Regions:
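Juxtamembrane intracellular "pre-TM" segments in multi-pass secondary transporters
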Residues: 177-205
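Conserved MFS/SLC helix-loop-helix module at the cytosolic interface between two early adjacent transmembrane helices
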Residues: 53-92
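Extracytoplasmic gate region of multi-pass secondary transporters
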Residues: 202-241
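Cytoplasmic helix-loop-helix junction between adjacent transmembrane helices
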Residues: 97-135
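Short hydrophobic/small-residue motifs within alpha-helical transmembrane segments
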Residues: 47-49, 137-138, 245
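Short hydrophobic/alpha-helical segments at membrane-entry points of transmembrane helices
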Residues: 92-98, 203-204
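Helix-loop-helix hairpin linking two adjacent transmembrane segments in secondary transporters
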Residues: 93, 122-124, 130-176
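Extracytoplasmic
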Residues: 7-37, 218-223
Length: 245
């Protein structure tokens, strides 16, 4: 498989880690910023809100931009947002950083999939996209537990600092490995929105919404639940997160 796919996989690993790692760091963040666990949990909501807002805007508003330039620019937004989170002096700045870092989420996955599929022959496109998204799966298995452990042992700011560094590494990797790719001149907002006329698209969206919604009701507060209900230590919580993921 082309090396560019591994650059994209590194990006999905970084994005997946920053999306979910907050759930394991809620007690640490709440204690450090002197806010309640429920209020801290809104940092997860803020990220999700940024994804919902950013995905269509970033995707539809950038169809005219060279795809290599776009992917690197999206990772720059990611680095900025996580950098703000790492150095946030208060809750408001941390929330702002979370929202900023989430704006590129959907666009990176969407554009990355198109770019990844275009790197290989048609018969290998499914495998190429799977390789790219393997970074997301690995982020849940390794990135989130490791980020939780680092955050609980050395401070949650370090976790976001390292995630920001991963984003920077991804941007550099893409800049050297990926060739310029012209945007689709036939693609436009009207053409992109036409997909919403399909009932199956809405069914898929509903399935995702209700399925993940049910999971995240509990998953968002899994660390404080385990900490208060079972008395588990930070290391034990990290192990539980690894097993669950």
């Amino acid at each position: 498989m082309p090396i560019q796919l591994y650059a994209l996989a590194l990006g999905t690993f970084a994005v997946g880690t920053t999306e979910f790692v907050m759930m394991g760091l809620l007690p640490s963040v709440a204690s450090d910023l002197a806010v309640s666990i429920p209020v801290t949990g809104l940092l997860v909501t803020g990220y999700a809100l940024g994804v919902v807002i950013g995905a269509p805007i970033m995707t539809l508003g950038t169809t005219h931009i060279d795809r290599k330039t776009l992917l690197i620019s999206l990772m720059a937004v990611f680095v900025l947002g996580n950098g703000l989170a790492a150095f946030a002096p208060n809750y408001a700045v941390l929330m702002f950083g979370r929202i900023i870092s989430s704006l590129m989420h959907g666009a990176f996955f969407g554009v990355g999939s198109v770019v990844g599929a275009g790197l290989v022959p048609k018969e290998k496109q499914a495998r190429a996209i799977a390789l790219m998204f393997s970074g997301l799966a690995i982020s849940n298995i390794i990135g989130v537990p490791l980020g939780t452990y680092i955050g609980q042992m050395f401070g949650w700011r370090l976790s976001f600092g390292l995630i920001s560094a991963l984003g920077l590494l991804t941007a550099l990797f893409l800049s050297f490995a990926l060739k310029p790719q012209a945007a689709d001149p036939l693609s436009g907002i009207k053409q992109e929105l036409a997909v919403l006329k399909r009932a199956r698209v809405w069914l898929a969206l509903a399935t995702t919404t209700f399925g993940f919604g049910g999971v995240f009701v509990v998953w968002t507060y899994i660390a404080p639940i385990l900490e208060t209900a079972t008395g588990l230590t930070p290391i034990a919580i990290t192990i539980v997160l690894f097993i669950i993921n």
